A protein has these predicted regions:
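Flexible, low-complexity linker/hinge segments
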Residues: 1-5, 118-139
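Conserved AMP-binding/adenylate-forming core of the ANL superfamily
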Residues: 2, 21-50, 58, 64, ...
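Conserved pre-ATP/AMP-binding loop-to-beta segment of ANL
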Residues: 19, 127-144, 151, 177-186
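Conserved AMP-binding A3 loop
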Residues: 31-33, 140-167
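AMP-binding/adenylate-forming catalytic core of the ANL superfamily
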Residues: 104, 337, 342-343, 365-452, ...
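Conserved AMP-binding/adenylation subdomain of ANL enzymes
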Residues: 166-186, 192-231, 245
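Gly/Ser/Thr-rich phosphate-binding loop
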Residues: 207, 230-233, 245-303, 314
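Conserved ATP/PPi-binding loop(s) of AMP-dependent carboxylate-activating enzymes
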Residues: 308-312, 323-354, 389-391
Length: 483
């Protein structure tokens, strides 16, 4: 491990970039030297505000050069950086902001007690060496899950783990990442830097000598055309819509060299179709918030493989008793990597369930072939992936059952052209009651957010029973919405 902690590797990349453009934001171009200057001033501002090692800093920021610099500055002072996604439902946002947060940093117009980027930038740079205060075993960042369990879980990653990641170190890149990095001349950035994927591929772009290009409106294919992007992250639903748009009215995507599909599995036939329509540009990444990237399929890999895990990542396929199984046999994936989270912040019960003996239990099912390629076949968890976000069925069922009109509620997922998967609910009415579907949708939205709202709600007399006599919602069939 280097003498200086994270983010030394990132700061070295910015220093090496010098006058090379590293971020384009509208009509503004920011060089490596300028971005490094922003990091230095923001770090000075955070220290002047009394913030340092171990302090939690919530970053409620848009996608700007200052936002990227603020995240790096938070690491420089040794804080626990907590990115807050825009649009997080109120109850979930309040939960995140109660997790030992010492300060909130915003773009402008702060709530009472918050700091703005502009205020922090008023602190002058003293011109001396930038002191890095991160301690190896301190938590460097919390990356929150989607919150579909009712409260988002904060995956806690230490400074030692951040330093162990390959992102900023070209010498450590596995072959698939090396191929991807060679295509990151102009990487499209959008959405939120609270996204683990968005931020880490931004750092990868710096290491590859490329430029991050900020898109205010991530509409595909328009954003690729407008910014002449060579690379972008894309969710499965967006990929499907892009392929359909290109079939109907092809746009000029000659600049595009890499689309990194993430967030949920891609059907093998749809991945082949995407490569047929878009060309050899589609990468398919597999990973989790808890582990980071586990493997990546390049355009030359044959679907449905998700590629080869790199040597620094251990992956075991285990049976229900926890015993490793041979190649070709399906089982649950357990993963161990130097860069993984150490657990969930302030959640010892869930941490004990998922993080045990140095391994992360993914609750995904898959197998290796004889050559070491990884394949995914399903999930052990009762979750539905909507727009690349995981939504647990249990909280949705409990929200529906909270209505006085409902006696029982069951939720299942099904493939959906627009969102990857969709939530479908089946409800048994309470005696003498007639459920109102609109009111039920509002109830779920208010409690859990838009992503958990069922696409369909079907009223049934009872749920089918399995051989054991217990209700078996796997026997419920969502309505066909393709017609």
């Amino acid at each position: 491990m280097p003498a200086d902690p994270y983010p030394r590797a990132v700061l070295d990349l910015l220093a090496a970039a010098g006058d090379r453009p590293v971020i384009e934001h509208g009509t503004r171009t920011v060089t490596g030297a300028q971005l490094l200057g922003l990091v230095r001033r923001l770090a000075a501002g955070l220290r002047a505000a009394g913030l340092g090692p171990g302090d939690g800093i919530a970053m409620m920021l848009g996608v700007t050069p200052e936002a990227f610099a603020a995240m790096i500055a938070g690491y420089a002072v040794g804080a626990r950086v907590v990115g807050v996604r825009p649009g997080l439902p109120g109850a979930q946002a309040r939960h995140v902001l109660r997790q030992d947060i010492a300060a909130i940093v915003t773009d402008a117009d702060p709530a009472q007690g918050a700091l703005t980027v502009a205020e922090l930038l008023e602190t002058p740079d003293d011109g001396g060496p930038l002191r890095l205060s991160g301690r190896p075993h301190d938590v460097a960042r919390l990356v929150h899950t989607s919150g579909s369990t009712g409260t988002p879980k904060g995956c806690a990653q230490t400074y030692a783990a951040m330093d162990a990641a390959w992102t900023a170190r070209p010498a450590a890149w596995p072959p698939a990442i090396k191929e991807l990095a060679s295509r990151l001349q102009r990487y499209l950035v959008f959405g939120s830097l609270a996204s683990q994927v968005m931020m880490e591929y931004g750092v990868l772009t710096l290491a590859a000598g490329g430029t991050m290009v900020v898109a205010d409106k991530p509409a595909f294919p328009d954003a690729i055309v407008e910014h002449r992007a060579s690379a972008s992250v894309i969710t499965v639903p967006r990929l499907y819509r892009l392929v359909a748009a290109q079939r109907a009215a092809p746009a000029d995507l000659s600049s595009l060299r890499a689309l990194m599909v993430s967030g949920s599995p891609v059907e093998a036939s749809r991945l082949r179709e995407a490569r047929d329509v878009l060309g050899p540009v589609v990468f398919h990444g597999y990973g989790q918030t808890e582990t980071g990237t586990i493997s990546m399929a390049t355009p030359s890999d044959v679907p449905p493989s998700v590629g080869f895990p790199p040597d620094v990542i251990d992956v075991e396929i285990r049976d229900p008793d926890g015993v490793p199984v041979p190649a070709g046999t399906d089982g649950e994936l357990y993963v161990r990597t130097p860069a993984q989270a150490i657990g969930y912040w302030a959640d010892p019960g869930e941490t004990a369930e998922v993080f045990a003996g140095g391994w992360v239990r993914t609750r995904d099912l898959g197998h290796f072939d004889d050559d070491g390629r990884l394949y995914l076949v399903g999930r052990t968890r009762d979750v539905i992936i909507v727009n690349a976000n995981l939504h647990y069925a249990g909280p949705i069922e409990r929200a529906l059952a909270a209505s006085p009109d409902i006696a029982e509620a069951y939720v299942v997922g099904a493939p959906d052209e627009d969102t990857g998967e969709a939530v479908h609910a089946f409800v048994v009415p309470a005696a003498g009651r007639t459920p109102d579907v609109g009111s039920l949708r509002t109830l779920v939205r208010d409690r859990l957010g838009d992503g958990c709202v069922p696409a369909t709600i079907t009223v049934i007399d009872e749920v089918p029973s399995g051989p054991s006599g217990k209700p078996d919602k796997r026997l419920l069939e969502p309505p066909d919405r393709t017609g």
